[in-house]
From Swiss-Prot:
This is Probable 2-(5''-triphosphoribosyl)-3'-dephosphocoenzyme-A synthase. It comes from the Bacteria. Involved in the formation of 2-(5''-phosphoribosyl)-3'-dephosphocoenzyme-A, the prosthetic group of the acyl-carrier protein of the malonate decarboxylase. NCBIfam families: malonate_mdcB. Gene3D superfamilies: Triphosphoribosyl-dephospho-CoA protein (1.10.4200.10). It comes from Acinetobacter calcoaceticus.
Amino acid sequence: MQTVQKHDHLFLDISQHAMRLDLLARTALYEEVSLAHKPGLVCPTTQGSHQDMDFALFERSIQSLTYYFQEQCLNGYHEVSFDSIRQCGIQAEQDMMAATKQINTHKGAIFNLGFASAAVGKCFAQDILLNAISISRMIQQTWQEELLHHLERNPNSHGQRMRSQYGITGAIEEVASGFKTVLDVAVPHYLEIYAKTGDKKRASLQALFALMSHLQDTNIVWRGGLSALYIVQDMAKQFLARGGVLQHNWMQDVSKVEDYFVRHHLSPGGSADLLGVTLFMLKVEHEFRNII
């Protein structure tokens, strides 16, 4: 991890940096939900497999999170306790649920990007060059043990029930790993397609399918069992093997996957959450490239 000499302006500007980070996080969430052709997921033109959600609901949800990521960035900068970071996230969940009338739109994003934002704050405090790798390492070094061993888990949550019933991991383990799946899978696929096409939307969709091909998505298992997970992973792998969004007829190919997901009421919500993390990390690296 690269460190550099302290700069006084960084300490003077931390509040401004945290505000910019907050906007980046909310923009990443907005771009994720705005992306079309996500199988089973909400976008501006479809509810996907969700009868209780639409694009306007997600917009209200994102608006309710204004200042949350700023606060978590400052929490990381000031090295507050793990429990304080967690309580900040719980309050954001309550605000989100109030805005959506108790529909869970962004619980995963609050958890994922909350710790990612706090990690950015700690990188600011230690004058560490900001990129996806340094954010990942900061999460692992600072909170991995507490995430894996001390975070209270609700035995009735669908994630915990998936762990107990099927032995699959979920969001807690992914965050504790420093978003290993994001770094190893999503970011490389995104960068490859963006370098070839210059199209951020196609790059994002390719990253989503890459995540779907690898992730043990508890949202899929919750709705369709392990058999559905294997089918989803295989469909995503086959799409990528055919060239993914580089195919001449890629939209027709994706539409077949979309139809299957809606018919079987499947929604890769875990992969969507990690696409949001992917976009956030790329935005942070670009925005703060020359800040240290």
